[in-house]
Amino acid sequence: MQKPNVIIIVCDTLRKDIIDLYGGPAKMPSLGRFAKDSVVYENAIAPAPWTFPSHVSLFTGLYPSEHGIHESKKAKMPQIVDANLRSRHTTIAEYLRERGYSTIGISANLMISKVTGFDRGFDQFYTFTHSPWIQSDIATQARNLGADMAQVAAMLLKKGDAKSIAKYGIEFLKIKIRERSMNYPLKKGAEVVNRKAAAMVRRLPFFLFLNYYEAHEPYKKFSDKETQDHLTGVKPIGREKVAYLKSQYVLEAEYLDTELGRLMDWLKKKKLYENSLIILTADHGQAFNEHGFMYHGIYLYDEIVRVPMVIKYPQGKKPARRDGYQSLVGVFDLIRNVLGGRNLDITTGSAYSESFGNAEFFPESYKHRIWYVEKNYERQRKAVYTDGYKLNLDVSAGKADEFLKGEKTVSAKSHKKEFAKLSRELDRLK
């Protein structure tokens, strides 16, 4: 019998509770149809609150503290990328290629690319960007100068740097033309991801990794400067703005669902669907000021680390909804087990998530707020979910950010036994 194809679909930044499958407001009928052929997991936890370490964990089966490729006070993006380029941890792609699989990776997130070391083990790897500017020298200058394009232009003008202004203006115009033609930021490359998948899958069995970027910021008609002001304590973001952003997030999820439906239709048309292990999940979620924080990274609140997980097993496994806990870290072992004909379950007794600080430098225009960033964000945090409880610990401060039973906050004094047990669980994460 032909080995099953393996397909991993990462819906970048898609939090669990936004999806109608889990009781959320985003109508995603394509995902609902897929779920009817699949096992829907209720408690999947991302191992990290942002893209890079979460994907490394997905590909290696190791938590961030185990693979070591994560942020810290000293390690920002250049150091993190370098660590991934030097990593020798075996990846899913390497494992499957050694077993005769054609390995294909397609990403709409520039962070997941050949340049950042995520192509290891892949025969083919394609990364889509709507903007060549992001990869240009002027992009580096832009990030160093300010939080958004308007700021960059103003600062260059003030400096009287005519050459840079002209170059920036041309690149800016190119971006705007391309963005308008593709309906960006609603569409962030999902159509291209699907088109590339159809073109790049040429032989069986195959491993196909897809990263869809639609749910990730930016969102339509909103300046990131307002978010940066909020994150650095300059000016809190207003409720109306937060509500607007969340409504755009829902629209992004609903558009993504259309493209997921097209992917599934293509797999069925090519008779690839039935004999495929298809794992759909997200690398992290997205916060909308539920705990005073916007977007993702840094914190381990549910809106950031609870993610969807829907798995279709090859040649049928009865559709079901499964409790317990699941982690992206378990995907590698699940693939090994499916290929070996063993236990087809990803559920575990405990799931963890980790954060080690702030991953990126804030723009130079916020250098007067570095004290605020360091005070609030340069901290180690770790969380564990087990037995219906969650302990979310600020390690640097030596205190709990959260202690929950279900979704309800409870006191450590009234749940001493459980608090002690979860504290011991967290000791395994160094």
Task: Write out the residue ranges for each language-model feature.
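Catalytic domains that recognize anionic headgroups
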Residues: 1-430
